[in-house]
Amino acid sequence: MIPGNRMLMVVLLCQVLLGGASHASLIPETGKKKVAEIQGHAGGRRSGQSHELLRDFEATLLQMFGLRRRPQPSKSAVIPDYMRDLYRLQSGEEEEEEQSQGTGLEYPERPASRANTVRSFHHEEHLENIPGTSESSAFRFLFNLSSIPENEVISSAELRLFREQVDQGPDWEQGFHRINIYEVMKPPAEMVPGHLITRLLDTRLVHHNVTRWETFDVSPAVLRWTREKQPNYGLAIEVTHLHQTRTHQGQHVRISRSLPQGSGDWAQLRPLLVTFGHDGRGHTLTRRRAKRSPKHHPQRSRKKNKNCRRHSLYVDFSDVGWNDWIVAPPGYQAFYCHGDCPFPLADHLNSTNHAIVQTLVNSVNSSIPKACCVPTELSAISMLYLDEYDKVVLKNYQEMVVEGCGCR
């Protein structure tokens, strides 16, 4: 069985076990009889056996999604706006120009071209202030990356910092700041207090008159931690205020919580580490164009057409109780293939030479089955979800949508 079909079959079986007859509309007519038989047999079993069967189905699904157990997201889990916007761009829900207004979001074409998984990480809440000169402020941040699977190869990583516009006077030349990003090379306990051994990863000169997100390349550090298994002592962020004092330190670049502002504001504006990786399965992320409304064609000719073709099948994640950890989409149109493969096979039935021969033999020998109506082309979907560690993940899953059917 094609992996995509097996995936859908398990979903449908889970829906039947969880919801009974209320989900019968999701099952093709030809399968309702078999589903009823399954339910009849299941009704005679002990409830413990049914729950065990359901757990097996769920475990199979989670394995397909690359998860070791079912995520149980906490109420404090935060979905960064950046990841939501990235999902919308990746899935083609909205154009980049519409999404980027006021957010500074640009689709990461180069990192995404080598990845099928994007993960986001917030730093551990405790911050370590690093004493510096009167013109700068610096902090050390720790990011726990232990939730990245062993089979996922990280290709790049970026650190996103939010900076707000600050009115410091009319003098343009006095409004420049330099933001330096360092990798901490040794644990603070082994160093002189107030001094870190670091290496520079990225730097940028910015002006205080703009509110936007800044993105810094921290790939060398993250690759050392994940590929080379080197110790992770965190990143150091230094903001140097050129030609000025520290009057507005902490107001321009959001690297620490501001007490007067609400926790919700800080949750969305705090520093964000984003990794791009590939687990070796399927294609890389590719930004899709915005979807247009489908054109409606007359269905009169199809009502009597029983030949092999694609039919609608919507899979709703809430029906299997997964809408608490799958952020988007709420469901998707999977489609399925059903219909006859009559002799002689028409060109539009997308048949193989073998299917043509098999159908020809069937016409004179009924003991040989007809060719079957099966998916001939499958496509991927993007999913945004919370994993077992409350980390937000954007991932491409292959062979989830039927694009074409044929007799094979």
UniProtKB/Swiss-Prot annotation:
Task: Quote the disruption phenotype from the UniProt entry.
Answer: Homozygous null embryos contain no primordial germ cells. They also lack an allantois, an extraembryonic mesodermal tissue derived from precursors in the proximal epiblast. Mandibular molar tooth germs arrest in the bud stage. Failure to form the primary enamel knot in the mandibular molar tooth buds at 13.5 dpc. Significantly reduces the expression of Lef1 and Axin2 in the maxillary molar tooth germs and mandibular molar buds at 13.5 dpc. Expression of Dkk2 and Sfrp2 expanded into the distal tooth mesenchyme in molar mandibular tooth buds at 13.5 dpc.
Gene3D superfamilies from the entry? 2.60.120.970, Cystine-knot cytokines
What biological-process terms (Gene Ontology) are attached?
A: ameloblast differentiation; anatomical structure formation involved in morphogenesis; angiogenesis; anterior/posterior axis specification; aortic valve morphogenesis; blood vessel development; blood vessel endothelial cell proliferation involved in sprouting angiogenesis; BMP signaling pathway
List the InterPro entries. Answer: BMP4_TGF_beta-like (IPR047833), Cystine-knot_cytokine (IPR029034), TGF-b_C (IPR001839), TGF-b_propeptide (IPR001111), TGF-beta-rel (IPR015615), TGFb_CS (IPR017948)
Keyword Chloroplast in the entry? The reply is no
Question: Residues where Phosphoserine occurs?
Answer: 91
Q: Which tissue types show expression of this protein?
A: In the cochlea, detected in nonprosensory regions and outer sulcus (at protein level). Prior to gastrulation, expressed in the extraembryonic ectoderm. Later, expressed in the extraembryonic mesoderm.
What main location does UniProt list? secreted
Q: Which residues are glycosylated?
A: 144, 209, 350, 365
The subunit structure is: Homodimer; disulfide-linked. Interacts with SOSTDC1, GREM2, RGMA, RGMB and RGMC. Part of a complex consisting of TWSG1 and CHRD. Interacts with the serine proteases, HTRA1 and HTRA3; the interaction with either inhibits BMP4-mediated signaling. The HTRA protease activity is required for this inhibition. Interacts with FBN1 (via N-terminal domain) and FBN2. Interacts with type I receptor BMPR1A. Interacts with type II receptor BMPR2. Interacts with FSTL1; this interaction inhibits the activation of the BMP4/Smad1/5/8 signaling pathway. Interacts with SCUBE3. Interacts with TGFBR3.
Q: What does this protein do?
A: Growth factor of the TGF-beta superfamily that plays essential roles in many developmental processes, including neurogenesis, vascular development, angiogenesis and osteogenesis. Acts in concert with PTHLH/PTHRP to stimulate ductal outgrowth during embryonic mammary development and to inhibit hair follicle induction. Initiates the canonical BMP signaling cascade by associating with type I receptor BMPR1A and type II receptor BMPR2. Once all three components are bound together in a complex at the cell surface, BMPR2 phosphorylates and activates BMPR1A.
Task: Output this protein's name.
Answer: Bone morphogenetic protein 4
Encoding gene (name): Bmp4
